């Protein structure tokens, strides 16, 4: 990919001499000893085979002042593209959604993230698909979708529960929660796909699943779909297959209808607050 030295250059042990591309990954080749570059046997764009020489370096004591140590790197610097990703993720956090949090406070209910964070041990939750948005780009501007449909209304991932009492492997759980502040916690195309993936992981790893199921069921307003019906959605089949695989716990506060109620009803244990309304049909 690139050469960082030329014949006659003094190099110190550990200096990156060249960068090679293999299997779509870039690999640094560093000097194993200090010395002088005598000649180089490759050029950018060449195909390199196993055991082929790349360059010849004659070992020598090298004056530190004569060695180009390269550009100093600030290890605390965050690249602009990474900063953009972090800012994008942060849009879905409660502290950046004050209006949504206020709506939950008004009904004396908790947010989806509060429930997940309080259930899992601190620092153990690995969220899947936090930057997913609703499949509505044909009807809604992208910026609005990013602001109003974080995670497409489904927070899900793997975390540990009661890790202080059990070994790490035994404490590991799949934790999922519909987010009622996002389109009434309805089931959209992207959060269905997220569920499909997480259910398959739970089956493979035999993970207990805790699912906060508040929400209004199927969402009719998604536009970015390729099928006329939802017969291609395997989520409910995958969810049913988890029965007997590991414990399934459903929790609900508030309204839980249609597809959300199916998720809840298939659980081994259901925990519902007194203000819950659960049914296969009804208002979202």
Residue ranges, per PLM feature:
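Short, Lys/Arg- and Gly-enriched loop/turn segments at beta-strand edges
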Residues: 23-30, 58-68
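A structural preference for short, pocket-lining loop segments at secondary-structure junctions
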Residues: 159-179, 194-221
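Extended active-site and interfacial segments that coordinate phosphate-rich ligands
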Residues: 176-202, 207, 268-270, 276-280, ...
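Short histidine-centered loop motifs in beta-beta connectors
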Residues: 1-10, 39-43
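A structural signal for short beta-strand/turn segments enriched in small hydrophobics and glycine
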Residues: 8-22, 45-57
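Short beta-strand-turn/beta-hairpin segments enriched in glycine/proline and small hydrophobics
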Residues: 1-2, 16-34, 239-240
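Intrinsically disordered, low-complexity segments enriched in small/flexible residues
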Residues: 65-173, 177-184
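Conserved catalytic cores of soluble enzyme domains
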Residues: 213-284
């Amino acid at each position: 990919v690139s050469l960082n030295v030329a014949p006659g250059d003094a190099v110190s042990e550990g200096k990156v001499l060249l960068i090679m591309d293999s299997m779509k990954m870039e690999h640094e080749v560093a000097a194993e000893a200090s010395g002088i570059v005598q000649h180089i046997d490759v050029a950018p764009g060449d195909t390199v085979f196993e055991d082929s020489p790349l360059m010849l370096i004659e070992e020598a004591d090298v004056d530190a002042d004569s060695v180009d140590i390269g550009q100093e790197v600030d290890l605390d610097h965050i690249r602009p593209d990474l900063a953009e990703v972090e800012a994008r993720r942060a849009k879905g956090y409660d502290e950046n959604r004050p209006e949504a949090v206020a709506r939950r406070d008004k009904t004396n209910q908790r947010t989806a993230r509060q429930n997940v964070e309080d259930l899992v041990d601190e620092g153990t939750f690995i969220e899947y698909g936090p930057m997913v948005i609703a499949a509505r780009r044909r009807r809604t501007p992208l910026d609005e979708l990013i602001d109003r449909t974080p995670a497409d209304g489904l927070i899900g991932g793997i975390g540990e529960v009661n890790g202080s009492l059990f070994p790490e492997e035994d404490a590991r759980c799949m934790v999922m929660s519909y987010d009622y502040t996002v389109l009434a916690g309805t089931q959209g195309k992207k959060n269905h796909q997220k569920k499909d993936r997480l259910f398959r992981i739970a089956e493979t790893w035999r993970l207990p699943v805790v699912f906060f199921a508040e929400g209004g069921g199927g969402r009719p307003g998604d536009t970015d779909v390729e099928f006329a019906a939802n017969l291609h959605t395997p989520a409910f089949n995958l969810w049913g297959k988890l029965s007997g695989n590991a414990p399934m716990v459903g929790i609900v506060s508030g309204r839980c209808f249609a597809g959300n109620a199916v998720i809840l009803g298939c659980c081994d244990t259901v925990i519902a607050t007194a203000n819950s309304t659960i049914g296969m049909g009804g208002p979202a």
